[in-house]
Swiss-Prot record:
InterPro entries: Plectin_eS10_N (IPR005326), Ribosomal_eS10 (IPR037447), WH-like_DNA-bd_sf (IPR036388). The lineage of its organism: Eukaryota, Metazoa, Chordata, Craniata, Vertebrata. Residues 155-166 have a biased composition (Gly residues). Residues 98-129 have a biased composition (Basic and acidic residues). Component of the small ribosomal subunit. It comes from Ictalurus punctatus (Channel catfish). Belongs to the eukaryotic ribosomal protein eS10 family. GO terms for molecular function: RNA binding; structural constituent of ribosome. Residues 143-154 have a biased composition (Low complexity). This is Small ribosomal subunit protein eS10. The gene is rps10. It is found in: Cytoplasm; Nucleus, Nucleolus.
Length: 166
C-alpha cells in the first residue's frame, strides 16, 4: 500500500523499540492508539505489518479482533538495516529485566530445613477429627432424614406447580 515514508518509519521505530505491535482490526480507525501523536492511521499499521509478515519478518497472532505481531530474528536485522541502528540497540522483548531483591526477608533458620509451619489451625483440625464420631459408631444409622415423622412436600415454581396446598 502506498503510504508516507514518515508513517512507515514511525511504525518500524515503535515495532523495533517494543519488539511487538498490537492493532485492533478496524480499518476505519483514524489513528493507531500508540502512534496517535504522529497521526498514523490504523490501516497503515495493519498494511505495514502485513508486508513484514509476508517477508517473514514478523509472526502474526489474531484474537478477539486484535492483531498481535512479534518480531523474528530476521525482522530485527532488517529493521536495524532499515533504520540504521547499531547492533547494541535491541528490542524490549530481548532485554533482561532487572529484578530487585525480594521485598520479604527470608526466614532465618537452618539452611537445609524448611521452617516449621504455623500451628494456627492444626489443634482445631485434630479436635474436629477426634470428636466427629466415636470409634466404632455406625455412620449409616446416622445418615438419612432423621427423627421427623411427618414429611411435607411442596410444589415447585413455574409450570409444574399444580394445586395450592389447603
Amino acid at each position: 500500500m502506498l503510504m508516507p515514508k514518515k508513517n512507515r518509519i514511525a511504525i518500524y521505530e515503535l515495532l523495533f523499540k517494543e519488539g511487538v505491535m498490537v492493532a485492533k482490526k478496524d480499518v476505519h480507525l483514524a489513528k493507531h492508539p500508540e502512534l496517535a501523536d504522529k497521526n498514523v492511521p490504523n490501516l497503515h499499521v495493519m498494511k505495514a505489518m502485513q508486508s513484514l509478515k509476508s517477508c517473514g519478518y514478523v509472526k502474526e497472532q489474531f484474537a478477539w479482533r486484535h492483531f498481535y505481531w512479534y518480531l523474528t530474528n530476521e525482522g530485527i536485522q532488517y529493521l536495524r538495516d532499515f533504520l540504521h541502528l547499531p547492533p547494541e540497540i535491541v528490542p524490549a522483548t530481548l532485554r533482561r529485566q532487572t529484578r530487585p531483591e525480594t521485598a520479604r526477608p527470608r526466614p532465618k533458620g537452618l539452611e537445609g530445613e524448611r521452617p516449621a509451619r504455623l500451628a494456627r489451625g492444626e489443634g482445631d483440625r485434630d479436635a474436629y477429627r477426634r470428636s466427629a464420631a466415636p470409634p466404632g459408631a455406625d455412620k449409616k444409622a446416622e445418615a438419612g432424614a432423621g427423627a421427623a415423622t411427618e414429611f411435607q412436600f411442596r410444589g415447585g415454581f413455574g409450570r409444574g406447580r399444580g394445586q395450592q396446598p389447603q
